[in-house]
């Protein structure tokens, strides 16, 4: 339930809400107003150790619960999430800033991830081949791996945690969750509803905090696997540190997603698609379109319509239904984004829509409006770096081949999109683009939960992505059994 009082956030360990043993706290502001809504503890190593001990103890019994029973328990959780959709969306808007429309969409995507986890009896089925030799049968069995952990970012405080702990727990593991200290309130509510669904204590533990919690998770010998979503430098660190300590790690990292706009595209739908991908959720998502490679033949017409439509977007508090672009997560991030816009201007890009000049309209809060640059090239930082904001760069290319070459020159390879009505163009794009997730006339090619989610190159560190069969493989270990009876 959302209240106006300033909340002091707690950890949840072994089925109970407990104060952190540390003394450091961090203020949590509403990004739309700058007003403090909570204080979150920056928990020390000792809190992580307690959470791991609780999860380790719970694993002894939870791992032996029949898979259909685990699935039924998750159905109860799923029902509670569905019953509380409106409240969950409001919490997201309050602490993250994204519009209520975007938050509602996130809630639904999170629920879909739990729906996947409820199908654990099917997902965990092994394989068998009788009579592999005279009187000998062979089979593969799947088992949980133990205590696992998830480290999640601020930009999807519901969806990304729900990619992780429901599926891991459905597979028989127990879980330690560390969500972003910037969005702790939604994590609290997810855990509350989890235990309302009747799960045994210690199956899910929540430790709030910052880098000390991350390091403690990566170094703890009893944690078998770590799932991470965040920026490229931190993802690289998590992967290298976690694997050095003998853990399985999946680390989903940064992005610089390109969209190629062909002359044969549906212009109206393409413009609206690019706007939605680039500027919804204030551009704070790893699947946002941040570069458009538009073919010269249609470039002027496309840009004219794009700029005109973008200038209609309203910026402001996400609770106001007319607003399309909400605030950025923190003042420090806003200043970073303004620095990138200034660098684009200094490097010679043409600023077609300037999102810096909106303070008079929106007042306090960490707002940057939709921003569009033309004349961008690969030497500019606004093309190279993940800005994580409503900032769109346009690069003009002569044809599809040049657009693909441009896209593949990025160090990131998370998602990529083509807008075209030509099947051959789409096929060429699909076969030659280097990205983990590809869209053809699909604005944000983030797959449904029953498919794996992962990029390539500097967008992903690991072997198995989240969700789908990749997720099941990540959270389980195999035993190959060869048997003969006399």
From Swiss-Prot:
> Which positions bind NAD(+)?
154, 178, 181-182, 231, 386
**Sorted alphabetically, which PROSITE patterns does this protein's record hold?**
ALDEHYDE_DEHYDR_CYS
Which InterPro entries does the record associate with it?
Answer: Ald_DH/histidinol_DH, Ald_DH_C, Ald_DH_CS_CYS, Ald_DH_N, Aldehyde_DH_dom, MeMal-semiAld_DH, MSDH_GmP_bac
Pathway(s) the chain acts in: Polyol metabolism; myo-inositol degradation into acetyl-CoA; acetyl-CoA from myo-inositol: step 7/7
Question: EC number(s) of the enzyme?
Answer: 1.2.1.27
Q: Name one GO biological process term.
A: valine catabolic process
Q: Reply yes or no: does the keyword NAD apply.
A: yes
Class of enzymatic activity (EC top level): oxidoreductase
User: Which keywords belong to this entry?
Assistant: NAD, Oxidoreductase
Q: Name one Pfam family in it.
A: Aldedh
The entry's active site is: 286 (nucleophile)
Instruction: Identify a single GO molecular function assigned to this protein.
Output: methylmalonate-semialdehyde dehydrogenase (acylating, NAD) activity
Among SUPFAM superfamilies, the record links this protein to: ALDH-like (SSF53720)
- Lineage top rank: taxon: Bacteria
Q: List the disulfide bonds.
A: none
Q: Which reaction does it catalyse?
A: 3-oxopropanoate + NAD(+) + CoA + H2O = hydrogencarbonate + acetyl-CoA + NADH + H(+); 2-methyl-3-oxopropanoate + NAD(+) + CoA + H2O = propanoyl-CoA + hydrogencarbonate + NADH + H(+)
Q: Which family does it belong to?
A: Belongs to the aldehyde dehydrogenase family. IolA subfamily.
Q: What does this protein do?
A: Catalyzes the oxidation of malonate semialdehyde (MSA) and methylmalonate semialdehyde (MMSA) into acetyl-CoA and propanoyl-CoA, respectively. Is involved in a myo-inositol catabolic pathway. Bicarbonate, and not CO2, is the end-product of the enzymatic reaction.
Assembly and partners are described as: Homotetramer.
Q: What protein name applies here?
A: Malonate-semialdehyde dehydrogenase 1
Supply the source organism for this entry.
Bacillus anthracis
* Source taxonomy: Bacteria, Bacillati, Bacillota, Bacilli, Bacillales
């Amino acid at each position: 339930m959302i209240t106006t009082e300033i909340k002091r956030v707690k950890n949840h360990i072994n089925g109970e809400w407990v104060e952190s043993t540390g003394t450091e706290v961090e203020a949590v502001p509403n990004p739309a107003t700058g007003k403090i809504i909570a204080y979150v503890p920056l928990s020390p190593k000792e809190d992580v150790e307690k959470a791991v001990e609780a999860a380790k103890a719970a694993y002894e019994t939870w791992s032996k619960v029949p898979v259909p029973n685990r699935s039924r328990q998750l159905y109860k959780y799923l029902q509670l999430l569905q019953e509380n959709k409106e409240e969950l969306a409001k919490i997201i808007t309050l602490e993250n800033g994204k519009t209520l429309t975007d938050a509602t969409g996130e809630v639904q995507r999170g629920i879909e991830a739990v729906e996947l986890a409820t199908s654990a009896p099917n997902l965990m089925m092994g394989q068998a081949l009788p009579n592999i030799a005279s009187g000998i049968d062979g089979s593969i069995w799947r088992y949980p791996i133990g205590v696992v952990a998830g480290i999640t970012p601020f930009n999807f405080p519901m969806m990304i945690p729900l990619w992780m702990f429901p599926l891991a727990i459905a597979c028989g593991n127990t879980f330690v969750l560390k969500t972003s200290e910037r969005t702790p309130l939604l994590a609290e509510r997810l855990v509350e509803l989890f235990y309302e669904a009747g799960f045994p204590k210690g199956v899910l533990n929540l430790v709030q905090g910052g880098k000390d919690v991350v390091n403690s998770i990566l170094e703890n010998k009893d944690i078998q696997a770590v799932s991470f979503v965040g920026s490229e430098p931190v993802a690289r660190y998590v992967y290298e540190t976690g694997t050095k300590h003998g853990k399985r790690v999946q680390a989903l990292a940064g992005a610089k997603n390109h969209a190629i706009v062909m002359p044969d595209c549906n212009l109206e739908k393409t413009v609206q698609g690019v706007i939605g991908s680039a500027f919804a959720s204030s551009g704070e998502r790893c699947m946002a379109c941040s570069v458009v490679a538009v073919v010269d033949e249609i470039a002027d017409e496309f840009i004219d319509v794009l700029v005109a439509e973008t200038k209609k977007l309203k910026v402001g508090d996400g609770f106001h239904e007319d607003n399309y672009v909400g605030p950025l997560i923190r003042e420090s991030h806003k200043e970073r984004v303004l620095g990138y816009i200034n660098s684009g201007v200094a490097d010679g890009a043409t600023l077609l829509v300037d999102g810096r000049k909106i303070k008079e309209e929106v007042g306090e809060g960490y707002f940057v409006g939709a921003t569009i640059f033309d004349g961008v090239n690969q030497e500019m930082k606004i093309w190279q770096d993940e800005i994580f904001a409503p900032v769109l760069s346009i690069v003009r290319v002569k044809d599809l081949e040049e657009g693909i070459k441009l896209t593949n020159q990025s160090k990131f390879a998370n998602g990529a999109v083509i807008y075209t009505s030509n099947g051959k163009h789409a096929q060429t794009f699909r076969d030659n683009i280097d990205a983990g997730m590809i869209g053809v006339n699909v604005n944000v090619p983030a797959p449904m939960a029953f498919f794996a989610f992962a990029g390539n190159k500097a967008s992903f560190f690991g072997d198995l992505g989240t969700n789908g069969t990749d997720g099941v493989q990540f959270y389980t270990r195999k035993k190959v059994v060869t048997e003969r009876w006399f």
